[in-house]
Structure formats: structure tokens, C-alpha cells
């Protein structure tokens, strides 16, 4: 591969995955949904239309940037 081809491709893509357990949420009388294991799942849309889910153990956020890249953030 010659240097001009390397310049067109740009830097290699990096993936960063971070997982954090969340604090238990207050008990609510009505539940918006259940995951496969029977846990509580709350779905909502963020500012840019990304999908956010909060379960008993983890929050999962799928973000879309303006550069059409998909970022998965588990927190």
C-alpha cells in the first residue's frame, strides 16, 4: 500500500465499551415493559432520537452521531 492510499483511508476505527451496574430504581406500580429475564425495562428517546433502555442491572444507550456512526454505550 503506497502512502497516498493510506492518507485516503484515515485513522483506524476504535471501539470503546464500558459497562457499569446502575443503582436500583424506585419500585413503581406500573411497569412499561419486561426484558427476556423478566426484569424491568424502560424505553425512551433521547435528544437525537437514540434509543435508551434502563433495566434492573444496566442502562443501554444507542447513540447516532451526525457522521453516521453508531455508538453503543452501556452504563
Swiss-Prot record:
Location of the region described as Disordered in the Swiss-Prot/TrEMBL record: 22-43
GO cellular component: nucleus
UniProt subcellular location: Nucleus
Principal subcellular localisation of the protein: nucleus
Top-rank taxon: Eukaryota
Keywords: ERV, Nucleus, Transposable element
Keyword ATP-binding found: no
Sequence ranges of Basic and acidic residues compositional bias: 32-43
Extra information: Protein expressed at very low level. Has a type 1 genome. The HERV-K(HML-2) family contains type 1 and type 2 genomes depending on the absence or presence of 292 nucleotides at the 5'-end of the env gene. Np9 proteins are translated from a doubly spliced transcript expressed exclusively by HERV-K(HML-2) type 1 proviral genomes. Np9 proteins share 14 N-terminal amino acids with HERV-K(HML-2) type 2 envelope proteins. The rest of the protein is encoded by a small exon located at the 3' end of the envelope gene. This exon shares the same splice acceptor site and therefore overlaps HERV-K(HML-2) type 2 Rec protein second exon.
Described function: May possess a function in tumorigenesis.
Protein name, UniProt field: Endogenous retrovirus group K member 5 Np9 protein
Organism: Homo sapiens
Lineage of the organism: Eukaryota, Metazoa, Chordata, Craniata, Vertebrata
Amino acid at each position: 500500500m503506497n502512502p497516498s492510499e493510506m492518507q485516503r483511508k484515515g485513522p483506524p476505527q476504535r471501539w470503546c465499551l464500558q459497562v457499569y451496574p446502575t443503582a436500583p430504581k424506585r419500585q413503581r406500580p406500573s411497569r412499561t415493559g419486561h426484558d427476556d429475564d423478566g426484569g424491568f425495562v424502560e424505553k425512551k428517546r433521547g435528544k437525537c432520537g437514540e434509543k435508551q433502555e434502563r433495566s434492573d442491572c444496566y442502562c443501554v444507550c444507542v447513540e447516532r452521531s451526525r457522521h453516521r456512526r453508531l455508538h453503543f454505550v452501556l452504563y
